[in-house]
Every structure is written in structure tokens, then in C-alpha cells.
Amino acid sequence: MITTIPKSINVTTIPLSGKILIEASAGTGKTFSLTILYIRLLLGITNHVKYKKGLLIKEILVVTFTEHTRAELEIRIKTYIKIFKTACIKKYSNNYVLSKLLSKITDFPKTIDILSKAENSIHELSIYTIHGFCYKILKLNKFNSELMLQNKILKHTYPLYLKISIKFWKYYFAFLSLDITSILLEYFNNPKTLLKEILPLLNKTQLISKLTKTKRKNIVQEYYILIKKIKLFKQKWANYSHLIHSEIIKTNVNKRIYTKSNLKRWINNITAWATQKQTKNFFIPSELKYFRYSFIIKKTTSEKILDDKFFKFIDTFLDSKFSLKEIFIIDASLEIKAMFMQEKIKNRYFEYDDLITFCWNMVNKNNFNISQTILKKYPVALIDEFQDTNNKQYNIFKKIYKKENLLILISDPKQAIYSFSGADITSYLQAKSNIKNQYFLDTNWRSSPKIINSINLLFSRLKNPFLTKNITFYPVKSSRINKTTKFEVNGKNQPALRFLLNKNKNISINEYKEWISITTAKYISYWISSGIKGNATITISNKVRTVNFSDIAIIVRNNLEAKTIQLELTKLNIQSLYLTSKNNIFQSKEILEILWILQAILNPNIERLLKRAMSTNIMSKNTKEIISIPNNHSYWIKLSQEFNQYLIFWNNYGILYVIQQLIINYNISNNNNLLHNFSPNIKNILYIGELLEEKSITIKNKFLLINWLKKNITQDFYLTKPKYIKPNYEKNNYIKIVSIHKSKGLEYPITIIPFATITFNKTVSTVEKICFNLNNTKIKKQKTLKIEKHKFSEDIRLLYVALTRSIIHCSIGISLAQTITQKKKIQKEKSKFKINVLRYIIQSGKNHISTKKLYTELSILKKNKNIEIISEIPNIIKKNFQIPTLNTNSQSLMHYQVSRKFNYNYNFTSYSQLKKNIKPSTMYSTLNTKKLFELNVKKKHCFENKILTPHTFPSGKIYGTLLHKILKNISFHKSINSNWLLKKLSEYNLDKRWCLILKNWMYSILYKNLDKNYNLRLSKLDSKNYIKELKFLLPIKKKLTALKLNNIFQTHQCSSLENKLCFHPIQGILSGSIDLVFLWKTKYFLVDYKSNWIGNSNQSYSQQNIKKIIKKHHYNFQLQLYSLVLHRYLKQHIKNYSFYNHFGGTYILFIRSINEIPSQNGIFYSIPNIEIIKKLEQIF
């Protein structure tokens, strides 16, 4: 361990070698500093000989932890390369840091040339998320690359976990008695609530691994042990209860608590419980605590109770843990995780975090070779947001970048708030302790001097504000450029921090929430209305402008807090948007109403459906009107005509047009308002219309479209791909409400933190205790206090993030009440942290809950001119400043911009659909009616005589599909499962006698020598070297016409089409799948199976005959398309790919003719025409 005092950093001069840790407080220019270091490495402005020549853009590795940050870094690096190049051309920059960097340049033409080359190769930027980097590294290894291709990424684990939890729930409870089941159902009433509790543990693989090694208790045995304890106690109480009253009276116990009536009632209640015939659960009367030895001693002046043995026994009894929750959680976690892993292996899934595990295993086991390969590819690495790392992630980089190899770690441990997603502050602190070169950024470039000084004051009053030894708070300096930054209302300069103080000492949590929400709404209303009049202004960079909606952000913890605030804002006509909200449109109230209306449009003559549609809030008909529909004939006709008209609109103009007409006809206004819970939301309705319009491109059948909608409504939220509501507000017309976690990295001129005085993390959960115990096996005493400290420390970091979002002003809600939280029972281990984090910081870390102490500390803070304490809300703020309502009713629909542009000719098509449109006159020109009749007679005769051969196997599309399924599912190396095959025959209503014929037929196909020169047989293919049914999508670049394709094939006679293709122009995507792609002796081949019936003998499948069939059915066109797919795939995956060296050719296997007879009948081999492929590439 290295003890280091971090130094203030100058990013233009810092030596660049070895491991470097840079801690960057909020607003200190972390990303800008990273870009300067990047440019230095690019230009070789470094003291280290190794990097003096400069590095290529692809050699500088940048890793971060979220896709959003990755994208931001990419933009910033691109921008500053361009900016610095311009500065080099001018030999001047008004940016202080860039001007310092310019002074380091000795050869400007060379520098400009390097930066120009960097700009030209900007697409080679090596910026990744941690998962993206691990994936890239794994692909360096051929074996892992194949592994990645074979497995499927499991993007969302919750649906699979939920499915497994339901399965676990069923079998676990099946073997438990009703009594134990009843106890467990008190903890969790269904699999979802269980999964919600254990999910954090399931996501921590290392802890699960540790848990498997611990000794597990049997839940049934533990139940009977605890029941036995309770029975024993009951027996002792029954024996001793008649003496308890007299023993208590003998002591000098507090008579105001232990009154005669209280004693009598308590003893009677406990005795009634103790004398019950049966003991089935863990219920213990709450009155028993009054007879604990420890409790009585506190309430008496006596030194000793006369006979204390029984009272001490009560103490011991109540200290026992009468719960099966922990055992159940451990059982559930281990079983569900084991089943989850089985499913992953079975379905060949891998999670994003598996990439990190795979990468660590590879680097750790094959350390030197792979590390050298990575070092050669990326000589330096910059890791952003390093505080969000964990042990495994850091160890990967530690293994690769040893000794003098440059590894720059940029972080802010004060903003480490993502423990729920796997980040581990302990890992960060451990890594920090091993790094010698530590620096910190000392200037805040974001906020006003007043905000900076106020936050410095708050956190500097504590020696260790974050409760963790190595998380140090360094006061930051303000930048001169922000000296004039200010917020004024009616000519009065607003303070940096304003504490909105509620002086009611007995306020409840709901009362406080209501009070602070109203106060927040009124302040915002006052600022906005003053801004509209020009009386509220913001000055940033010497530019003055009026306060607008977009300047204000309310920072909350969760969705409930956001809704509480939104309710009060709505009352004052203030639109707001919770930016963290993920409301699934399929769970909205409007979606079901749209479904009912569309069902009625498709069935306008069904009274039931029509009535249901009219009952919706969208159509808003009252009960009387709905009931009268069948009796009022003229109204019924009118209504039917209206719905028929909607159907015509749907057919002619699309479903979105229908929904727009509904909004106009029924005058739906924009009630995007929490006060109108039953009013339809116009923006939700239009968004639903957009989704349906988009889906109708691929689902043309209206009834199938309705079924798709119904399925998405009824399916579990987590088991379907959610479509999140995207409000269409103008940027400047709403107040932003954002969660603390989502606000990290963002900035706002004015912020309000209404609920900071409410305790964040209230109680320690069972899962948290299990996780802590597994991580801290050496700690044996006061574990709960340790967990509390850990949680409290994270809460302080959350508060720090919230406070540092502001540029000019921050209002914070606070109360004098002892604690604003729900009343909870006192824990057995007395909590050290009695107050919330805001009070803890204000009170300089003093853990007092007295009102007087808080008021004293606030008075001290008030002396600072940048801080204001408001306990009486000014009268001018109390006035209701109504913000003008925006015109968003149905008549303004003409100005509404639909967020999607629809191309109604855009479609999915396939080879089969294209060839379907061949002109009928040419399609059957070679087969006359007489010939067709003769063929059918022959086939019928074969079946009548019951001769079972591949030639007599039923023909047609259905049976062709069956043959393809069999070939897809059978192994090329193992025997065919007869039971499975019989099941398939049954599904297709075929005689079971076909089973043996089919098995032998399939073996003939697998063992057939396709090429005598190569001795090529499917049975000889290695399972790693082939893919069955390779699905593909080919985007059509421009409009596809039959003429284009016909011209391409016409110019190449060897591939010409016998019949011209004929179809309507198409835009969209061509989809399909290739039956088999395989690698054989360095070359790649594709196979297409054909089950066409040509004749009842092998001679019918001669090369001459099958060539005719291929031309007639456009199979040569199909082969060229498939060849294009394989050609493009190989180009992307093989370095130095050559068509002539790597593309082996194509096979069409007419499988009815393939048997043990040594003949090439039915086997068509060709090498595709590369010129046609090149021309097709211009289309697809």
C-alpha cells in the first residue's frame, strides 16, 4: 500500500508514464482534461521516450463505463483535435490551457500534418465501453471469436430470471407444509416480489460463488428448531407467570410505565398466547419486551431484580432470530442462479458481464502473450469514470499495463453512486492505494464562484465528510470566466444556496412532501412569470437572458417524488417532464381504449364492440347515450356509417390518419395533466398511432395488427420489448425533473432539491446483510452498523452529486423535525446514523437530532452572504402566478409534427415473393394440362401400391417444409432420434411407416459424396465449420425493379433467366435464409435443399433435367442472391479475403434423388458469377 498526498495537476506538463490517477471533482473539466492528454499523446508531447514519436489515433485506448459517456468522449476528442489544429494554423488560442499547449509545439507544419491525419482517420478512434473493449479483446483470440459468433447476447436478464423464479416457486413450495408456506408468504407473496429482493445478489457472481461454499441450513429443520424454542418458552412462561407481577412490583420500577392495569393486561395477553394448544408460526407478543431484563433495568433504580434468571431468559429468547427469511433467500438465490446458468448453457446465451469474466480469464491465464498483443495494439490506455469500476475490471488493466506502461485513470470517488449496477467503491479505493502518481483537478469551470464557495463551506466543515478514509474532499477554486455569473429577480441578486426551512417540529413525511412541493411550484411559477415580464434574468459569460423553463431542473430520488412535484406544478399550469421516466406506452390507459375503438372499426355492426368503443374516454359518450344505441335506429345507422368511414380512411390513408380524425372529431384536448387522470392524453394517442402506422408496414392484415397490439398489452411488461413514451414537448416549455443518478454529469443554471431532508436508505435489508457478511467475513461485531455506515456514505455521495449540478442557484428543502421518515421499530443494534445526510453535513458531522442544534448550525451558515435560510415564505411567492396555457387542443393538430416519416412502399420481401409474380402465361408454358394429369396419375398409383420411397414421399410446400425441418434439426454425426421423427410424422398426419424410410434417406444425404475429387460428404463436416439456416437481411439501397434484375441476368447468358421476373417496384429489405453454409479445405460453400418432385426414378433428376428446373424456377437467381450474402459475410470476417481463394461454390441438392446409388443425379454444383455479384452489390 502506498500513502500518497495527491497534487494539483497541470494537464499540459504532467509526466506521462506508469500508472496515473487523476481525481476530478464535479465541474472541474474532467472530459476536457482527458482530451488534452489525448492530444499530447497524439503529438508526442511527453517526457517518456517511448511516446516521443507520438501515437496513432487507433493506438490510444479510451475506456468508459456507459454508452452515453463513450459517445460524448468521441465527439469531444474529434472537436478538440479540430480546434487545436485551427489554433496551430493561427498559432494562437484564447483558451488558456490550449495556449499553454501551443507553447510546447516546436514544429507547427509537422503538428498540423499529424492532426490532419488524425482527422482523416477519426473513424479509427479506439473509444469503448468496458464491455465493448472486452469484446474487442476476445475477438483477438480466434477461439474466443468463434465462441462469440456461436453464442447469443442476453441483453435483458430479467425476463429469464422471472421465468426461472416462477418455476422455482412452484417446485419449492410443492414439498413444504402449509405452516411453513404461510410463514414464507409473509415475506414474499409471489415470485416477482422474491426476485425483486434477491436480484442484487443474483447479479453479483462472486458473492454467489462464496455463498455456495457456506454451510446451508435446511428450512424444514430450522422451522422445527425455532418452533421447539417457542414451545419451551411458552411452557416456562406458563410455569412462572403467576410470580411475574410480584417480582416486578418488588423493584423500584417506573410506575408510570408499569402500572397495575398495564401489568395485568400484558401478562394476560402473553399468558393467553403461551397457553394456546398449537404453535404453528413465529408470532411473539409485543408486550413481552416489557419483561426483558435489559428493559426493566433501564426503567428501575434497583441494582438487581430479586429473581433475575427468568427475566434474563426472556432477553435471550427475544434475541433469538425467529425467521426463515434468510434461509429462504439463500435457497432461492442459489437455486435460481444455478437454473439460470443451466438455461444460459442450454441456449448458448452470454451476458454483457460475461464478456468481462471471459476477458479476465483470458488475460489471467495466458498473461504474457495476450497482454503483449494488447499492448502492441494499444500502447496507452485512459480509463474514464474509474470510480465506477470493480475489482475484476481493474485487474484486467492492471495485468496488461505493468511498470512504465502508461495507464491514466480519471475518476471522482465523491460521485461513486452506481453500486446497484456492480460498481464497487472498495475496489476503487484498493486500486488507489497502490498508485503512486496521484493528482486532482483544482478549478471548477462550471459553476459560479458563489455556488463553489457555498459547497466548499458545507463539506469543508467536516474532517471526513464521506465517512471513508480515502475519499477526500478538496475545496476547489472558481474560474475567472464565471465571475459575472448571476441570477437576478426584480433586480435582486439571488443567493447561491437557499434552504427552504419548515419549522414544524412534528410534521409527518406526507405533510412535508406536500408543503415542499407547493413551495417549489410557487417559487418556479414566480421565477417563470418574472422571466416572461423580463424581471428574472440569468447572466452567464457576460450574456444576459431571461429565465426560461429550460433553465430549471428539479432533482429527485425516484418516480414517486417526481409525481408529487408534478401534481403541484400542474395546478399552476407548469408543464414538467420526468426525464428518468420509462413509462411503457403499452401500459398506458389510452392504449386499451385505442384497441377497443379499432376492434369496433373492423366490426361496426357488432353492438357489443360498438358500445365498448363509445364508453371510452376518447369518445366520451355518457351511459345514457350508450344504452340507447340499439333503440335509436337513426343514431345506430349514423354510428355504423361513421365507423365504416373510419375503415375507408384506414384502407386509403393508414391507421395514423384514422386516429388523427378521431382526435379532431371528438375534440380531444391535450390533458397531459395529473389533475385529469381520466382524460386521454393527446400525445400518447398520437404516439400509439405512430407505432401502429410503423407496424402496419410489416403487418398488412388489419386483424393480425390488432392481435399484435393485444398481445403487447396483455403480455408482462418485462417479457416484451417496451416502447417508452416520448413526450413531444418543445425544449423550452417544460421544467425538467431528473433523478440524482441520471443527473450525474449534467448541469443546470437553477436546481431545486426538494426532498433532501428525507432519509434515502432507511433500513438494512436481509440481502444487504447477506452481501455484507460474504464480503466481510473477518468482521464479527456490529455488522449492521457497518452496513449502515456503508449506505450512509453512499447517501452523502448522492447528496454531493445533487448539490453540484447547479451553475448559479440551488434551493434545498429542509425541516426542523427530528427525522423526516416513516416510523420504524428501533433495531436491535442501535443505529449510529440517527439523522439524514443533509442534516449530518449541516451539523458538521455531529450526530444529534435536536432541533436546537440544527437551528444553531443553520444560523451559522446564514452568516455567509452566499447562503440564505427562508423559514417564512415571502408573500410575493405565495401568490399563484398562473403560467399561460399552451394551445394544444385537437384543432392544433395541423401543426403537430409526427416524429416518424413513413414510406408506404417500404416493405420486407424475399426471393419467393419476387418469383411469385412471374407471368402465368410463361410460368407453365412447358407443362401442358395433359402432362400434369399424367404426372398426378403416376403419383397416385405409387401411393395406392404403398411403395414407400423418397420418390413417393408426399410432395408440396407443407411436406417440403417438413423435410427442411428434419435436415435442420438432425446431427451430421449422430444417429437420428426415432421418437422425435415419429412425433414430427404425427404432426404432419403421416404414417409412422415413413420413419425408417426417412432415417435411411437422411443418412444417404449425409453420407453422399458430393465431390469425388474432394471426397466431400456432409457427415465429415466438423460441427464448428458449418451453420444451418443462415438468416440474412439485405437492405435495398434504391428502388428495386424487375427490369434492373432482368437486365443484369440478361447480359450474362450463363446465368440468364428463362422467364422474366415481373413484380411491382420495391423498397425495403430482402430477407431469407440459406439452408447450409460450410467450410471445407479452406473454402466456403453454400447448399440449398430442394424437395421438388420431378419423376419417380433417379433418371428423372439427370443434370439435363435439373438444369431445366433450375432455370424455370429461377433457382439461378436465388443462388446469385445467396452467393452475394456469403460473399459479403466472408469479406467482413476474413482478413485479405479473395473470392477466388475463399469462395468454393454453391450446391443445389434435389434430395429425392439422393440415395446409396453412386450417381451424381440431383446434385447441381456451380461457381457463382462474380460480375453478377458485383452488380447486385450496387442494388443491395
Curated annotation (Swiss-Prot):
The keyword DNA-binding applies. Heterotrimer of RecB, RecC and RecD. All subunits contribute to DNA-binding. Interacts with RecA. Residues 3-448 form the UvrD-like helicase ATP-binding domain. InterPro entries: DNA_helicase_UvrD-like_C, DNA_helicase_UvrD/REP, P-loop_NTPase, PDDEXK-like_dom_sf, RecB, Restrct_endonuc-II-like, UvrD-like_ATP-bd. It comes from the Bacteria. The gene is recB. This is RecBCD enzyme subunit RecB. Keywords: ATP-binding, DNA damage, DNA repair, DNA-binding, Exonuclease, Helicase, Hydrolase, Isomerase, Magnesium, Metal-binding, Nuclease, Nucleotide-binding. A helicase/nuclease that prepares dsDNA breaks (DSB) for recombinational DNA repair. Binds to DSBs and unwinds DNA via a highly rapid and processive ATP-dependent bidirectional helicase activity. Unwinds dsDNA until it encounters a Chi (crossover hotspot instigator) sequence from the 3' direction. Cuts ssDNA a few nucleotides 3' to the Chi site. The properties and activities of the enzyme are changed at Chi. The Chi-altered holoenzyme produces a long 3'-ssDNA overhang and facilitates RecA-binding to the ssDNA for homologous DNA recombination and repair. The N-terminal DNA-binding domain is a ssDNA-dependent ATPase and has ATP-dependent 3'-5' helicase function. This domain interacts with RecC. The C-terminal domain has nuclease activity and interacts with RecD. It interacts with RecA, facilitating its loading onto ssDNA. Coiled coil: none annotated. GO terms for cellular component: cytosol; exodeoxyribonuclease V complex. Belongs to the helicase family. UvrD subfamily. Mg(2+) binds at H964, D1075, D1088. CDD domains: RecB_C-like. It catalyses: Exonucleolytic cleavage (in the presence of ATP) in either 5'- to 3'- or 3'- to 5'-direction to yield 5'-phosphooligonucleotides; Couples ATP hydrolysis with the unwinding of duplex DNA by translocating in the 3'-5' direction; ATP + H2O = ADP + phosphate + H(+). It comes from Buchnera aphidicola subsp. Baizongia pistaciae (strain Bp). HAMAP family: RecB. The keyword Transmembrane does not apply.
